[in-house]
Amino acid sequence: MASPVTVLENPIPKSGQHLLFFLTSKQQLALEQRPIESSLGYSAYVDHGVSQGVIVNPSSIAAAMRSSLITVYGITKPGTDKQYISVISPTYNLIANRQNQPIETTQKALAACSDNDRNNWVYYLNLPQGTAQYAIYELNIQDSTSAPTVYSGPTPSGNSNLAAVYFSPNKDRFIIFSNTDTRHYLYWVNSTLQSANRIAGTGSVMSASPLAATTITNVQTRSMTIFLYYMDVNTLLNRIVGKVTDNEIHWYANQVVEGAPPMKVDTLLTGVVVEEKWNCLYYIPDGDTEFRAFNDTIRDSFFDEPREG
């Protein structure tokens, strides 16, 4: 039986793509990014099946641009105890490994970043077989399958959230997490070196704090500024700024974000940089039930020198 079908031109400027929607043999929505120049190749959609349950909550979702298309990742759960890493928009499809098996996670954390081309990197936590210490797992997603890479050096807390950013001059990723210290701190790890580094001044971070990171890249100086936001033990929104050069980050002093409402203790957090002038943060304030926007104007005072604590 022939499938229903519809097509639109991708509205992203210079994408050169048609977005072709149709049904798979399992009667699920498929999307292929077909080049307008039909002689060019494309990746055929592979249906790994829909997770017959819900998007897990509490958990995390993450959005990234891939091949001129906004892709949203989440953790889904069928009617069993297993949870799977999935694409949840613009289609709903399990991500599979090279053996065509769905990729499991036992935890709630999820983060993603993009090279603004064909590559997405998705990060989550799992227990490597035969161990009791959680590890950060990385999926490099170019199509519908990926072989996980395990970061064996860092020791994230099992209830840690994650943030991830891409550094285009070196084609590196930086992942931020909270560690298993008695006193929680935030740490960062570089995708090339894979060793954990404590972020000085973050000793007030709340256990299981939400994390959000935005960036501004300077192509001429081959550097990047990271604006990292988190919740402290008093449920206040904190900010710490880092300057990336090569494989290193120089962190400045952490600061409570002036004027930001206290955070609901179980809220998550996300943000986006606007015109390189301010960061727009979304979270649920204490006593509220909806995500509210707060604009944090970028100032020179963000770059005070760091201190231990």
UniProtKB/Swiss-Prot annotation:
Its EC number is 3.4.21.-. GO terms for cellular component: extracellular region; membrane. Glycans are attached at N190, N295. One of its GO terms (biological process) is proteolysis. Keywords: Cell wall, Glycoprotein, Hydrolase, Membrane, Protease, Secreted, Serine protease, Signal. One of its GO terms (molecular function) is serine-type peptidase activity. It is a peripheral membrane protein. It is found in: Secreted, Cell wall; Membrane. This is Wall-associated proteinase. Coiled coil: none annotated. The keyword Glycoprotein applies. It is an enzyme of class 3 (hydrolase). It comes from Coccidioides posadasii (strain C735). May participate in wall plasticization and/or intussusception or in cell wall turnover.
